[in-house]
Amino acid sequence: MKKYLITALMLVMVLVVSACSSSPQVNEKNTDSTTASSETSATRPKLEIKASFYPMYEFTRQVAGDRANVDILIPANVEPHEWEPTAQDIAEITNADLLVYNGAGMEGWVDQILSSTTGSKLAVVEASKGLQIMDGIAEEEGSEGEHEEGHADHDSHDHGDLDPHVWLSPALAIQEVRNIQQELSRLSPDDATVFEANANAYIAQLEKLDQEFRQGLKNTKRKDFITQHAAFGYLAREYGLTQVPIAGLAPDQEPSAKKMSEIVNFAKTHHVKTIFFETLVSSSFADTIASEIGAKSAVLDPLEGITDQEKAQNVNYLSIMRNNLAALQKALNE
């Protein structure tokens, strides 16, 4: 609770400073000397967009193309579940044209910001809005996998313990891309045709990825997998699998001795040979279980961040998801 009060105080300071110092901004990047009677895409200021974490950044960048400057808020080496904005982050969000975030409880800091920016120019896209959001899984629930009951259509900001990891299902990622496209088109109607074309091109790649998952996981020997935390419920539901998470929705949540025992028993009973861990948190619990049952550990990436080095190597959502598919195929056919 204290961290949200601190965030609220920072918001008040930022808004006061912004009100005192705001002035028209000139985009110096677009200095094309076209006749001023009709703006073209070369002379219009680009949209300034803040995206909460990597999937939102990638989806937005693919749709916006060169019509916007898209920046990511949460650094690649920081777990998004834990991140809180600084005063500088809040100022940058407040001065942006658009904030793109996943929602469904992923970014707990968003509601404070939105409640304090009423009346500002800031528009928002909750990319998961309108999707069927799953209930989360509690730490002490049974080890037979994720709660997969659908939740009501996601139309509010009262998320509770919902599962926010919708981007890990390519089929749902498509819907998030459409939500982003629609808001970009509303903000910049003159570029709506470009946004639609960009979205269609990227969605075609996501549809191909979706088919690769369907075909690649259809005839595996087993359908259950053990993973570090409950991030893969949507992927499991979409492709007929069962995730067995060591921890709940929070990746750094320490499982109880009872839960660890349940996971070990499940792994032994079902002859599990691979325990999945992820990149932004310690793999100690996964390694402990793997060691106890004589299994190996492997990465299943929740795609919550990529490094600048990975970007330079053209690592992206599509390539990481294909790595996840390959890892699942290998583990489920052992």
Task: List PLM regions with ranges.
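Extracytoplasmic metal-acquisition and chelation regions
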Residues: K2-T7, C20-E334
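Hydrophobic helical h-region of N-terminal Sec-dependent signal peptides
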Residues: I6-V14
